[in-house]
Amino acid sequence: MATTPINGHATKSPSLDAAEARRLKHNHADVVIIGAGVLGCALAVALGRQGRSVILLEASLKEPDRIVGELLQPGGVQALEKLGLRDCLEGIDSIPVKGYYVSYFNDPVPIPYPKPTPASPPPEGRCFHHGRFVMKLREAAMACPNVSVVETKATDLVTCSHTQQVLGVECTSKDNVRACYFGHLTVVADGYASKFRKQHHPHTPKVSSRFWGLELIDTKLPMPYYGHVLLSDNAPILLYQIGTHETRILVDIPENLPSASVKNGGVKSHMRNVVLPSLPESVQPAFIAALEQGQLRSMPNSFLPAATNTTPGLVILGDALNMRHPLTGGGMTVAFNDVVTLRNLLSPEKVPNLGDTKRVMKQLSTFHWERKKAASVINILAQALYSLFAADNQYLRALQRGCFRYFQLGLVDGPAGLLGGLIQKPSVLFVHFFSVALLSLWVLLREYPPYLFPVALFKCIMTFWTACVVIFPYMLIEAFC
């Protein structure tokens, strides 16, 4: 064979054997998925358990090694439970996450995830090594009788020249043998650097900064089981434990930052001279050790609004479809919620035959708007919070001070619920954001003596205008695009 199928099978029926033969001998299935990452594996299992025949394509089935996709919010854990995949969080040395620890110039505030009811157990997220989690999801896909996992590199989409409908995927194996895989529906889930996005997505990712990451060994965090956000005069720093002995640190470095320029010694010099002094003392020894080992890696921080699918036979999902700044760790939560939504919309009860292109297209149009119930809050919050936490002018810094003061007053349940993917109401985000803005104005007014009231008033107007500029563009994108 041109490619290497890897399958796990339960008790088979004759019809299942026929479907498997169709996948393996004729390279044909109901659904072909490009990318056996977080979303691709979850979708393959979800559709396979509905009785759909699925071919899952992945260029390399080796364990991936990434510095993002390591924090799953409680809302993502809940979506994983709906998919019957929560056990994928076990056996990978994952660490419970109970909320956030925000430090503003070394003044900390804990922000626990809110309980649904006083008698309920507190919601819990998980941190882990990304690769270990993906391998567990791949095991689940391989164990699904209706799914065939094939290690091969997708190179192009097979398209009907008359109707422009996508019919399948052209691939090349490690032995450089070409093959095509056909399905009624082709799913592109090949990540942030998608090679198929450009032809079928109207938007281009916008990169504002990069996260530079190190893995710290046996460091002591100020507040275990909490994601740490460190705020200062510099861009935000994230810390969270991903294993018994490992802690991830991500340092946001905006583009063209002078202290990280080659002239000033590059990123490593920025880490040593700017980042190190701002870290908690308990973290500094492990940070120095990791920095000396030279394990610095980076990922772009991108923003990409979603777009309605218009190509028959194709759906783009995951980071190939929609990205937001990873500051809030919401990417996988959006992905799993998307899988839940799409699974429900494409269920055999609603779409008996995925070859019914007209009905599938109608459901995909519905999917674009239905997914926003979970995705919009996370997308808007990620972009707005990054603007505040990476404040680079006096008005954004005023909003940053107001935001931290808001947390200090104990008004954390709403923000924590939004961050955790537990509250999926944009109206709640709107109320909290402008409550922060109004509190920022009060804090700003108190910083000036009465005789400078005209100056303070002008700065209040500019600060409120800045708040509107921060959030309204993203709210409009989510509402109308």
UniProtKB/Swiss-Prot annotation:
Disulfide bonds: none annotated. FAD binds at residues 38-39, 58-59, 66, 138, 319, 332. InterPro entries: FAD/NAD-bd_sf, Squalene_epoxidase, Squalene_monox. It comes from the Eukaryota. Its cofactor is FAD. It is a multi-pass membrane protein. GO terms for cellular component: endoplasmic reticulum; endoplasmic reticulum membrane. Its EC number is 1.14.14.17. It is found in: Endoplasmic reticulum membrane; Microsome membrane. Signal peptide: none annotated. One of its GO terms (biological process) is ergosterol biosynthetic process. It catalyses: squalene + reduced [NADPH--hemoprotein reductase] + O2 = (S)-2,3-epoxysqualene + oxidized [NADPH--hemoprotein reductase] + H2O + H(+). Belongs to the squalene monooxygenase family. In Aspergillus, the biosynthesis pathway of the sterol precursors leading to the prevalent sterol ergosterol differs from yeast. The ring system of lanosterol in S.cerevisiae is firstly demethylised in three enzymatic steps leading to the intermediate zymosterol and secondly a methyl group is added to zymosterol by the sterol 24-C-methyltransferase to form fecosterol. In Aspergillus, lanosterol is firstly transmethylated by the sterol 24-C-methyltransferase leading to the intermediate eburicol and secondly demethylated in three steps to form fecosterol. This is Squalene epoxidase erg1. It comes from Aspergillus fumigatus (strain ATCC MYA-4609 / CBS 101355 / FGSC A1100 / Af293).
